[in-house]
């Protein structure tokens, strides 16, 4: 019911605040230190105008899917296992989403923002 919806919205907001220091998630808005991640699902990695990306990320051909985003938002070790060691050059200062339920919630949220 309503309590579950409000609880989920609060949990998403709490978890997303960690991202919001650098990223926006609003249609048509300019990003912050990091790109706006509205519509990130299905988009190519390292291609948002106005941001500097590593050569690796720009030329990777990575498309942001549930699987690739989960790897990217995980800890550094998981990110490097999935994408390769070159990904260590990313400017994104991120320690990763630790809890499985938080990861699912954030991915569900990002998937709807398009």
Identify the role of each PLM range.
Residues 33-35, 49-102:
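Axial heme c-ligation environment in periplasmic c-type cytochrome domains
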Residues 28, 43-46, 99:
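Solvent-exposed loop/turn segments at secondary-structure junctions
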Residues 41-44, 73, 110:
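Hydrophobic aliphatic residues
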Residues 1-11, 111-114:
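N-terminal export/targeting leaders of redox proteins
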Residues 102-112:
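Thiol-/selenol-based redox modules, centered on thioredoxin-like
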Residues 7-32, 37-38:
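Sequence/structural segment immediately N-terminal to covalent heme-attachment motifs in c-type
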Residues 23-26, 73, 114:
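Protein kinase-like catalytic domain
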Residues 40-52:
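Short microdomains enriched in Cys/His and/or Lys/Arg
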């Amino acid at each position: 019911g309503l309590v579950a919806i409000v609880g989920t919205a609060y949990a998403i907001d709490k978890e997303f605040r960690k991202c919001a220091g650098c990223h926006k998630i609003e249609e048509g808005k300019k990003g912050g230190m990091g790109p706006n991640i509205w519509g990130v699902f299905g988009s190519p990695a390292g291609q948002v105008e106005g941001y500097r990306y590593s050569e690796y990320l720009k030329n990777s051909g990575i498309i942001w899917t549930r699987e690739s985003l989960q790897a990217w938002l995980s800890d550094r070790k998981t990110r490097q296992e999935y994408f390769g060691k070159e990904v260590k050059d990313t400017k994104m200062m991120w320690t990763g989403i630790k809890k499985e339920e938080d990861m699912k919630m954030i991915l569900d949220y990002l998937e709807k923002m398009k």
